[in-house]
């Protein structure tokens, strides 16, 4: 009897809908919990030349992408080169080794005939230039200018001026030029109006002088036609 009641309860619509909803939620959770393939992310890379005089920051997805961007950035289109680690000169040849490197790794570009050298050996090549540098330098005043935009559509943007005295006192000022585009439009509008007015004046003057010369050549007194010149010039200006 109890078994029959349990069977009837399973066929009851409420219990049936409950089982269906629970099963649907389980399937949904399984679908959502499945790991999705991660999209490749660009990693920041720092690249220097063989003499360490030029450093560039490049965002690359892979080793091949880094090589292409290094060729374009350093203008090495027709020059063979390869990448090594700046700290020890290890050649970077495989994608697995590139992905295993840390994010702050610095790469060095070596062209044909160039060899990796530690920074100490490069520093001994110019002992005279290093000897002229003072041991300690004290900045009396330093002024920095930072031009940035709050909106990509800004014409000029904002200018931040910062002055530092004796590395102790600092003063900064922000100059917002967001409305510079509107000011330039008004200036251009007034300049256009001035040029149009000047053109009308010159055109009216030339018309008056032309009719004056025609009247003089025909032997008629210019005063007789002076009254009719103004309406003619006004018609031309319109």
Curated annotation (Swiss-Prot):
Q: What is the effect of changing residue 125 to A/Q?
A: Does not affect ability to mediate lipid droplet fusion
Q: Which GO terms describe its biological process?
A: apoptotic process; execution phase of apoptosis; lipid droplet fusion; lipid droplet organization; lipid storage; negative regulation of lipid catabolic process; negative regulation of triglyceride metabolic process; regulation of apoptotic process
A single Pfam family it belongs to is: CIDE-N
Entry annotated with the keyword Nucleotide-binding: no
Listed GO CC annotations: cytosol; endoplasmic reticulum; lipid droplet; nucleus
Q: Which reaction does it catalyse?
A: a triacyl-sn-glycerol(in) = a triacyl-sn-glycerol(out)
- Could you say which protein family the record assigns here? Belongs to the CIDE family.
Implicated in which disease? Answer: In omental adipose tissue of obese patients matched for BMI, expression levels tend to correlate with insulin sensitivity. Expression is increased 2-3 fold in the group of patients with high insulin sensitivity, compared to the insulin-resistant group. This observation is consistent with the idea that triglyceride storage in adipocytes plays an important role in sequestering triglycerides and fatty acids away from the circulation and peripheral tissues, thus enhancing insulin sensitivity in liver and muscle. This effect is not significant in subcutaneous adipose tissue.
**Free-text note on domains in this protein's UniProt record:** The CIDE-N domain is involved in homodimerization which is crucial for its function in promoting lipid exchange and transfer.
Name-wise, this protein is Lipid transferase CIDEC
Gene for this chain: CIDEC
């Amino acid at each position: 009897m109890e078994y029959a009641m349990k069977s009837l309860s399973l066929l009851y619509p409420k219990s049936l809908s409950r089982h269906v909803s629970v099963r649907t939620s389980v399937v949904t959770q399984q679908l959502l919990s499945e790991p999705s393939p991660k999209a490749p992310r660009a990693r920041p890379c720092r690249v220097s030349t063989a003499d360490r005089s030029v450093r560039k920051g490049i965002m690359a997805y892979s080793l091949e992408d880094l090589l292409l961007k290094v060729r374009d950035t350093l203008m090495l289109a027709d020059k063979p080169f390869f990448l090594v680690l700046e700290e020890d000169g290890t050649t970077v040849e495989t994608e697995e080794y590139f992905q295993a490197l840390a994010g702050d790794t610095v790469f060095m570009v070596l062209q044909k005939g160039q060899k990796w050298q530690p920074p100490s050996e490069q520093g001994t090549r110019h002992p005279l230039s290093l000897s002229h540098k003072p041991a300690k330098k004290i900045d009396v005043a330093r002024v920095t200018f930072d031009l940035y935009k709050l909106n990509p559509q800004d014409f000029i943007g904002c200018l931040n001026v910062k002055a530092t005295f004796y590395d102790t006192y600092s003063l900064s000022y922000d100059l917002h030029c967001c409305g510079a585009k509107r000011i330039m439009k008004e200036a251009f509008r007034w300049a256009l109006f001035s040029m149009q007015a000047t053109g009308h004046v010159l055109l009216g003057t030339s018309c008056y002088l032309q009719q004056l010369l025609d009247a003089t050549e025909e032997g008629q007194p210019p005063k007789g036609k002076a009254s009719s010149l103004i309406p003619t010039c006004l018609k031309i200006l319109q």
